[in-house]
Design a protein with these regions (language model features):
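Catalytic-center loop of serine/cysteine hydrolases
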Residues: 1-64, 68
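Short linear capping/connector segments at secondary-structure termini
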Residues: 30-36, 129-132, 269-270
Length: 276
């Protein structure tokens, strides 16, 4: 048993080092890309700039990311990830209200994903992106299918197993989904573009909320630095269902003030919950 534990620990160390190395390689390549004139940049470097701008989460950076990815595609029409990331950037623009989501725009987004997988059907990143987009469209079965394909190809990428876990919990496969969400949190608690582990923790909170586990939800809530409106609202619902008092709690008072002007119908739609 001790030997098995040692091998498990070694596996975890290797996984975390691999994640760090890949991230380090991308950062080094991105720094070189920033020093190059545009006319000398490769498709891969344009792709990295697009990904970097995507993770800045502003309207201006989103628009710049689209330009970067268009240039990546122009430089190499067989860069599958450039198509997939452009679809992701468009999805971000819809989600954050940077641009209006029309049938035409959604058609373009889906065409980009189809093109990405046509170019390289074995690119796990493309399947991951497809899972993300299907989740945002509330097509949870397709999100699960794409997430499973990506996970089969790369079971140790926290972004991959995270979206797979998100799809699973929305299909009421709670225990299985929790395993993947917990593993993603352990491998990479602070995702790229984030400064805290709040996003991963919010996903775990949702899973335990769906299991109606107040104690575990409270444990996770106390680890979150800035509670998002979904976690806040679901926490209220869970307290109510358990007949627990909460109106004197700091988290409730702070959220009441912070979220008072939100368009709740829009926000709840962004939770991508399964109404069934």
């Amino acid at each position: 048993r001790v030997k098995e534990d040692i091998f498990d620990i070694q596996d975890e160390i290797v996984k975390k080092i691999t994640i760090a190395l890949i991230g380090g390689i991308e950062i080094s390549s991105l720094k070189r890309a920033h020093r190059k004139p545009t006319e000398n940049m490769t498709s891969y470097e344009f792709l990295l700039k697009g990904k970097d701008n995507h993770h800045k989460f502003t309207k201006e950076a989103n628009e710049e990311a689209i330009k970067n990815l268009d240039l990546a595609i122009s430089a190499d029409a067989n860069n599958a990830q450039a198509y997939a990331w452009k679809a992701c950037v468009m999805g971000q623009a819809f989600y954050r209200g940077f641009t209006e989501m029309t049938d035409e725009k959604m058609g373009e987004l889906l065409t980009l994903l189809e093109k990405a997988l046509e170019v390289d059907p074995n690119d796990f990143e493309c399947h991951r992106m497809q899972a993300e987009v299907y989740l945002s469209m509330h097509d949870f079965e397709k999100s699960k299918a794409s997430g499973q394909k990506a996970t089969n190809m790369n079971p140790n990428d926290p972004r991959v197993i995270s979206i797979y876990g998100e799809a699973l919990i929305r299909l009421n496969e709670l225990d299985k989904g929790l395993l993947y969400l917990q593993k993603a949190y352990e491998l990479d608690p602070i995702p790229q573009g984030q400064t805290t582990g709040d996003r991963r923790l919010a996903s775990l909170f949702l899973a335990h909320y769906l299991k109606n586990d107040l104690d575990k939800c409270n444990e996770i809530k106390d680890k979150i630095i800035n509670i998002d409106n979904r976690t806040w609202l679901l926490c209220i619902d869970l307290y109510n269902s358990c007949s627990k008092e909460y109106k004197e709690e700091n988290w409730y008072k702070e959220g009441l003030n912070e979220f008072k002007d939100l368009d709740w119908s829009l926000e709840v739609d962004r939770y991508h919950l399964n109404n069934q």
